[in-house]
């Protein structure tokens, strides 16, 4: 079994491209991770996700602990076997979903107590329990438990939240079972305050995580402020470890973040947009519901090799989406995921050539 490692092969200014080696295979960076929240990428077969070029996908601890439960998944052979995906899986810690989806959520030093959004059952999620669940799932990359600082937050609110995340990170690290080829990432917080981001990074680097995520962005602060934070936050992290920007997935945001030193991304945008009839292309987005596509016999993108573009016209996709056929969601999602993997491939090629990005979609 391979050791977990990150090898930077090319660098252009702050942008890096390379390979992350894991127990479940290699992933090329910069990488975009499709979101498979409940053990599935919506409207896609796992084999189809691999065909789009994805090297890794994301699963969600909160949703999987509720249904079908981590204990059931481990009895069935782990998440990889359960969903027939043999490549790397990163699982988030569950904290963000607990705080955003659950009613009567209460945050204490111990962890977060909450009621299930499904049936109202009460649960307690702690750094130890979150790490244990991710171990049971067999996650290739486990995320430390954190509090995603709401935006906007005052300096003092952000400081208190960041310090709690640091204490939780310590407990997560102490609970993590080290195995060859598996990894645990810490999450730095601090909202939009440089001093807090620097302190958070310093504290977490001392815990020697295998990689680091920048959390608490794309929560309403806007691109300009997000880029301002990314102008300095990645520089506080080790050069030789992966950097993951959580929940960011607009093409222009990805391109801007890569140019500031980020290696990994995840977002529901390509899948959610696909189900809602929006396609991403190199020439901008296409709302396939628009009546102007009813008689358009051309593909979404003439040089895209996804099944939607190889085999079907915009008129057919328009028809499927307008009448609510499942095939419409499948084809639009497949196209969007292919577009995002093509975008990452383009980004990696530009870094290898030492070229500035001259595109934003």
From Swiss-Prot:
InterPro entries: ArchSynthase1/Queuine_TRR, TGT, TGT-like_sf, tRNA_ribo_trans-like. It catalyses: 7-aminomethyl-7-carbaguanine + guanosine(34) in tRNA = 7-aminomethyl-7-carbaguanosine(34) in tRNA + guanine. Transmembrane segments: none annotated. GO terms for biological process: queuosine biosynthetic process; tRNA wobble guanine modification; tRNA-guanine transglycosylation. The active site is at residues 92, 266. Pathway: tRNA modification; tRNA-queuosine biosynthesis. The keyword Metal-binding applies. One of its GO terms (cellular component) is cytoplasm. Its cofactor is Zn(2+). Keywords: Glycosyltransferase, Metal-binding, Queuosine biosynthesis, Transferase, tRNA processing, Zinc. Substrate binds at residues 92-96, 146, 189, 216. The keyword Zinc applies. Its EC number is 2.4.2.29. GO terms for molecular function: metal ion binding; tRNA-guanosine(34) queuine transglycosylase activity. Zn(2+) binds at residues 304, 306, 309, 335. Residues 247-253, 271-275 are annotated as: RNA binding. Binds 1 zinc ion per subunit. Catalyzes the base-exchange of a guanine (G) residue with the queuine precursor 7-aminomethyl-7-deazaguanine (PreQ1) at position 34 (anticodon wobble position) in tRNAs with GU(N) anticodons (tRNA-Asp, -Asn, -His and -Tyr). Catalysis occurs through a double-displacement mechanism. The nucleophile active site attacks the C1' of nucleotide 34 to detach the guanine base from the RNA, forming a covalent enzyme-RNA intermediate. The proton acceptor active site deprotonates the incoming PreQ1, allowing a nucleophilic attack on the C1' of the ribose to form the product. Belongs to the queuine tRNA-ribosyltransferase family. Homodimer. Within each dimer, one monomer is responsible for RNA recognition and catalysis, while the other monomer binds to the replacement base PreQ1. This is Queuine tRNA-ribosyltransferase. It comes from Rickettsia rickettsii (strain Sheila Smith). The lineage of its organism: Bacteria, Pseudomonadati, Pseudomonadota, Alphaproteobacteria, Rickettsiales.
């Amino acid at each position: 079994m391979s050791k977990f490692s990150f090898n930077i092969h090319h660098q252009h200014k702050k942008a890096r491209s390379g390979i992350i080696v894991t127990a479940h295979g290699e992933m090329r960076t910069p990488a975009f991770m499709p979101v498979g929240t409940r053990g599935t990428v919506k409207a896609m077969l796992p084999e189809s996700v691999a065909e789009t070029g994805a090297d890794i996908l994301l699963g969600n601890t909160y949703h999987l602990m509720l249904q079908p439960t981590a204990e059931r998944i481990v009895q069935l052979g782990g998440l990889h076997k359960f969903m027939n995906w043999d490549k790397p899986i990163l699982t988030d810690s569950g904290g963000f979903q607990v705080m955003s989806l659950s009613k009567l959520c209460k945050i204490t030093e111990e962890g977060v107590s909450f009621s299930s959004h499904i049936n109202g059952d009460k649960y307690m999620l702690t750094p130890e329990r979150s790490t244990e669940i991710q171990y049971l799932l067999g996650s290739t990359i486990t995320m430390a438990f954190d509090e995603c600082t709401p935006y906007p937050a005052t300096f003092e609110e952000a400081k208190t939240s960041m310090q709690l995340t640091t204490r939780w990170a310590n407990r997560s690290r102490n609970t993590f079972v080290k195995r060859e080829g598996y990894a645990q990432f810490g999450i730095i917080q601090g909202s939009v305050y440089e001093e807090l981001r620097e302190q958070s990074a310093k504290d977490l680097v001392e815990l020697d995580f295998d990689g680091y995520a920048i959390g608490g962005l794309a929560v309403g602060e806007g691109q300009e402020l997000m880029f301002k934070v990314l102008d300095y936050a990645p520089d506080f992290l080790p050069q030789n470890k992966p950097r993951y920007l959580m929940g960011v997935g607009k093409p222009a945001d990805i391109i801007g973040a890569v140019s500031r030193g980020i290696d990994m991304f995840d977002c529901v945008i390509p899948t959610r947009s696909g189900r809602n009839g929006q396609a991403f292309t190199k020439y901008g987005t296409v709302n396939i519901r628009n009546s102007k596509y009813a008689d358009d016999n051309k593909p979404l993108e003439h040089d895209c090799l996804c099944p939607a573009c190889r085999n079907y016209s915009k008129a057919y996709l328009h028809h499927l989406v307008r009448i609510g056929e499942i095939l419409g969601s499948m084809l639009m999602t497949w196209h969007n995921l292919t577009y995002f993997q093509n975008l990452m491939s383009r980004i990696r090629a530009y870094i290898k050539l030492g070229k500035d990005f001259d595109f934003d979609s």
